[in-house]
Every structure is written in C-alpha cells, then in structure tokens.
Amino acid sequence: MTKLLVVDDEKNIRKLYETELTREGYDVVTVESAEDALEKLETDPPDLIVLDIRLEGMDGIDCLRTIMEKRRDLPVILNSAYSTYKQDFASWMADAYVVKSADLSELKTTIVECLEKRGKA
C-alpha cells in the first residue's frame, strides 16, 4: 500500500486529508510540524509527502530543502491556502503545488500523477 505523509499544522486539514486519502486506498500518516515530518522520514519513510508551506517553527520550504538533501527521489506536493506561491514551487524542487480546498479532487489527481511520474504508483 502506498504511504502518504501529510504535514499540516491545522488539525482539521490533517483529519480531512487522512479520511479522504484513506478512502482512496492510501496508508496516510499525519504530523503537525516540519520537525515531526523529518523524523518520520527517517523512522517510517513515506512514498509521497503533502507539505504545507506555512508551519509553526521550521516552515515548509526549509523542510522541503532538508528532504531534498536526504531523499531527492521522494515526491513532494506543496500545499497552501495561498495561490501566490504557485509560481515558485518548481524553484523549490517540489513536484507540484496544490492550493488547499475543501474539494480534494485536484490533490488526489496530483498525487496519482506524481507517483506515476516517479514510478511509485
């Protein structure tokens, strides 16, 4: 089963993503901080990460840079409520950028595309 790591400091977002993505057949692990995500990367590596940009403590961009230093092969989807970041995601070495929405269809499609692109589907 494909394992996804969702990193978001908002509990309701983590719960929504966990519920909806589990329904899609994924094994979903959620954490609330970049630091927790980096720990999971070492102890229970995912197949893909959905990473919020604005996090308490270390932000999502610094977390992404650390992830890329360790696991360049790991697909990462940046996820934020702010569409203004969309133009910058490629320069940050993320695979995709999805604006947060109650409708998760774009996120679900992007997850499939990123996994297929990286040969992990």
Give the ranges of each region predicted by the language model.
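Charged docking surfaces used in two-component/phosphorelay signaling
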Residues: 15-23
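Short amphipathic alpha-helix used as the core "switch/output" element in two-component signaling
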Residues: 39, 61-72
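Short hydrophobic/Thr-rich beta-strand motif most characteristic of the beta2 strand and flanking loop
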Residues: 25-32, 40
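Active-site residues of response regulator receiver
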Residues: 52
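C-terminal output helix
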Residues: 102-115, 119
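Acidic catalytic/metal-coordinating carboxylates
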Residues: 33, 59-62
